[in-house]
Amino acid sequence: MTSGNDVSENLQFIEQQLRELTKQGCQLVVTPENSLLFDNALAYQVIAEELNSGPIQSKLAQLAKELQTWLVIGSFPIRSNATHLYSACLVFDDNGALVAHYNKMHLFDVEVEDEHGSYRESDCFSHGTQPQVIDTPVGRLGLSICYDLRFPHLYNILREQGADIILVPAAFTAVTGEAHWEILLRARAIENQAWVIGVGQCGYHSANRQTWGHSMVIDPWGKVVTQGAATPCNLVAEIELHQVEKVRKAMPVASHQKISNLINNEDKE
């Protein structure tokens, strides 16, 4: 998806793709980060809504209910206080209920060698504080957003909380995406022996932003099952949860973990 600065156009595109994917029998549909709006801090403030309130969330809930599918919105600006927002991943069930949300914990405050140059998400957003997992018909989902991908301990926690599928809606820059996107996704899948679904923005956006795309689904062994390119596309994959059990049983790395036990023991001393 190549989201722009027109919310109605982005929402219309999401609806079109959602209708097409549900015709194919998809039980769970995930959009990229910033899928409803890809713009600047002021624009996010304008469209931001209170959690589980407002016309945009109402429309998304209505679509999920009408089409009888679980819908994960990669990120949407949710108000945290008068001046700041959360970049929140929203999960709607097939009855249209908002059943989970995750506030992005790691904000992208970095310098990138591209036309945009300096990125400061903390100018607009507040840091989330809580990992989030949710049971769905396709498995237990662990939620994360974009820059979170570089912080493996978060994913260890998601696995400890029972996640067997990890979602990574993102808007990786073209520069960082080319260098690290696939490597990081596969690493998180291998480390946690879980399915990883990376859903990326792609193409050119306003404010000299270019995103990498290349959405992909990775199995618990780290194999890329299906992959997109640098242009908008829909990826469809069958998630086989028995592979999670198979890999974890054959190589029980969680029970072999010593570092987390060491840290926990130090905290008790």
Where do the model's predicted regions map?
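Short polar catalytic/cofactor-binding loops
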Residues: M1-N5
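Cys-nucleophile CN-hydrolase/nitrilase-fold catalytic domain and related Cys-dependent amidase chemistry
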Residues: V7, L11-N95, H101, F172-R188, ...
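Short beta->alpha transition motifs characteristic of CBS
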Residues: Y44, L90, H101-F108, M216, ...
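Hydrophobic residues at beta-strand termini and immediately following loops
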Residues: I47, Y102, I134, V199, ...
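CN hydrolase (nitrilase-like) catalytic-core segments centered on the catalytic cysteine
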Residues: N52-V72, R140, C146-L235
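Short beta-strand scaffold segments in enzyme catalytic cores
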Residues: I73-S75, A88-V91, Q132-I134, S215-V217, ...
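Active-site catalytic loop in hydrolytic enzyme cores
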Residues: N81-Q161, A174-T176, I183, K249-V253
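A short C-terminal boundary segment appended to hydrolase-like catalytic domains
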Residues: H242-E269
